[in-house]
Amino acid sequence: MTNLKKWKTLKSKMVLDNYWCQVRQDEVELPNGKIIDDYFVSIKPDVAMVLPITSSKKIIFVRQYRHAVGEFFLELPAGNFDPTKESAEVAAIRELTEETGYIPQEFRKIGTLYDKPSKDTNQIHLFLAENVSKVGEQQLDITEEIEVVFIPVESVLEKIVQGEITVAGTVAALLLALKFIS
């Protein structure tokens, strides 16, 4: 049993609320009595992320530009979803199909992680999609330009170590999936 105590929220107000971003400013009291009046929380939708593997044991990644840091990244297919409109499972398959044109023959949830719980509210729901097959072309959003990349399962760990795969959620999903990959 821990003696740690939660913070108390004294006041909360939305300081930014638009389609792309919601930010809440909280006034909180710490267990030691200190007051922080400008603790900012990013309210983000949950993410469905899928690790797709072909029958030839290649993992399908997407390479895309991320404007916040001005770089291209290798990531697993993923996207935001609204749990009042679709399940994490449905969202994961939708994102896989939209971003890569592939669908899975076998599909299962392998975990749920918090993205960045010090500032963000969202969770990442992780799925393993095995024996995926191509069923069509990508159906990308207007903000997306995505290259589909195939990497053999046995090469992935080295690519993480070499710094070629650096997005935290993708790295966590890959490491977690090692237990489940047959």
Predicted regions and their residues:
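A short coil-to-beta-strand element that immediately follows conserved catalytic motifs
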Residues: 8, 103-110
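Acidic, metal-coordinating catalytic segment for phosphate/diphosphate chemistry
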Residues: 13-49, 54-55
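Short, solvent-exposed loop/turn elements at beta->coil junctions and helix N-caps
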Residues: 12-14, 111-116
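Nudix hydrolase/Nudix homology domain
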Residues: 2-7, 72, 141-182
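Conserved Nudix-box catalytic region and its N-terminal flanking loop in Nudix hydrolases
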Residues: 2-6, 39, 48-94, 140-142
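Active-site-adjacent beta-strand/loop module that shapes the phosphate/pyrophosphate-binding cleft
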Residues: 25-32, 116-135
